[in-house]
């Protein structure tokens, strides 16, 4: 049993920051995966999982373009602060750069990832597509314009994952 998946990002934009870095944006993209790592957008799809199965991702087609990039802003952390008058507020704070900035390779490593979630008796596959991957050492941005993949569902024994 398999599920076919096709995702495309026809364009992206960079939101300039005061320090000269940028935060890339894509249509319908979400942000903030891990504080300290490059602030790159991702797209999320939720797919119901067939009973007692796990999926293996097979990328069948990937169209990408690599280009030079200005520095990408790290994902900030959020801290709860209390003002003098006792009100609380959330403040974004930059933390030391995370592992995504330390490697000479693209981050995230894979353009497509899968994890599982349960809601009551239903299981869901959380498919994360990374339309942009960043190599901070070389200052390169990989734009994954289009990806096609197969999710091959393999039955598993109960109680193991």
Annotated model-derived regions:
Residues 1-161:
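Extracellular pro-sequences of secreted precursors
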């Amino acid at each position: 049993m398999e599920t076919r998946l096709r995702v495309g990002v026809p364009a992206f934009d960079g939101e300039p920051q005061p320090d000269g870095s940028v935060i890339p944006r894509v249509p319908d993209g979400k942000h903030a995966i891990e504080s300290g790592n490059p602030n790159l957008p991702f797209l999320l799809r939720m797919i119901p999982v067939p009973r007692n199965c796990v999926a293996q991702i097979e990328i069948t087609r990937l169209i990408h373009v690599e280009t030079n990039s200005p520095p990408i802003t790290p994902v900030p952390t959020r801290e709860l602060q209390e003002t003098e008058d006792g009100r609380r507020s959330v403040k974004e704070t930059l933390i030391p750069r995370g592992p995504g900035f330390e490697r000479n390779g693209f981050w995230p490593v894979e353009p497509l990832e899968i994890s599982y979630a349960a809601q009551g008796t239903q299981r869901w596959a959380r498919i994360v597509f990374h339309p942009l991957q960043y190599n901070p050492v070389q200052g390169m941005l990989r734009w994954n314009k289009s990806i096609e993949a197969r999710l091959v569902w393999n039955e598993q024994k109960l109680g193991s994952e």
